[in-house]
């Protein structure tokens, strides 16, 4: 789906992370969760629905069954709209749509993927990891979702949280690139992992792999940080 290509996870900048590893005791504080209506919470907050919400959900499912040739057709239609809401940062509306999709198909990969992305954007990395992992269990061929999963774990490492390590991130990125060798975003993140491991020559190798795959996805802020540690062996970036 084209809208997945503009996910905000893919736009995480490396510029804010000038250290090679998180400072001791620098773990980020847990985000304060705002109060939202149940329909705007991921999977309704995993709580029983109110009578009003359940009635609305039942009517939605019945309407889809009457209007579409199949549940799969309805899921595809609403997933496209939901990803558009993600792309325009309308996260509450996107959450509601993905919740509805989950009601149509409890095993919808789009629902778990989309809600995982939303959870990450809301600062709940643990929930994002659980949702994205479930999506990958349902369809392990989704290399772009695997990169999103790796990005969340990399964010955990960068924030000094226990939900991700560099080795875990590297494993997921290597897997994603085996599925799609031209995934520039995966090469960029792999370059960042090598940077954190202080293997700057390898970081440059991966950086140039990203350049060849899609120059528009290069993080030039990160490139400047890498260049400060070691000049570009190819002499392209100075």
Model-flagged regions — what are they?
Residues 19-88:
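N-terminal leader/linker segments that initiate helical-solenoid repeat arrays
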Residues 83-84, 109-185:
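Alpha-helical adaptor scaffolds
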Residues 21-31, 37, 66, 73, ...:
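Terminal, low-structured helical/coil segments at or just beyond the last alpha-helical repeat
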Residues 95, 129, 163, 170, ...:
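Conserved positions within tetratricopeptide repeat
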Residues 1-22:
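Bacterial Sec-dependent N-terminal signal peptides
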Residues 48-58, 86-95, 123-126, 162-170:
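Helix-turn-helix repeat elements of alpha-solenoid scaffolds
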């Amino acid at each position: 789906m084209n809208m997945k290509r503009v996910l905000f996870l893919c736009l995480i900048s490396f510029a804010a992370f000038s250290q090679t590893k998180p400072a001791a005791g620098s773990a980020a504080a847990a985000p304060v969760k705002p109060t939202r209506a149940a329909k705007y919470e991921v999977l309704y907050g995993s709580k029983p629905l109110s009578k009003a919400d359940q009635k609305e959900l039942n009517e939605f499912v019945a309407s889809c069954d009457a209007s579409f040739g199949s549940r799969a057709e309805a899921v595809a239609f609403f997933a496209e709209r939901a990803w558009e809401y993600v792309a325009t940062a309308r996260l509450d509306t996107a959450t509601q749509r993905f919740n509805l999709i989950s009601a149509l198909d409890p095993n919808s990969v789009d629902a778990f993927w989309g809600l995982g992305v939303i959870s990450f954007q809301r600062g709940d990395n643990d929930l994002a990891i659980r949702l994205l992992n479930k999506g990958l269990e349902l369809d392990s061929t989704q290399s772009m979702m695997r990169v999103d999963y790796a990005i969340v774990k990399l964010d955990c490492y960068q924030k000094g949280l226990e939900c991700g390590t560099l080795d875990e991130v590297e494993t997921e990125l290597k897997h994603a690139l085996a599925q799609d060798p031209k995934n520039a975003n995966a090469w960029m993140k792999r370059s960042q992992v090598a940077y954190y491991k202080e293997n700057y020559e390898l970081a440059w190798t991966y950086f140039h792999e990203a350049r060849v795959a899609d120059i528009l996805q290069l993080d030039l802020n990160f490139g400047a940080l890498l260049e400060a540690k070691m000049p570009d062996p190819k002499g392209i970036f100075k």
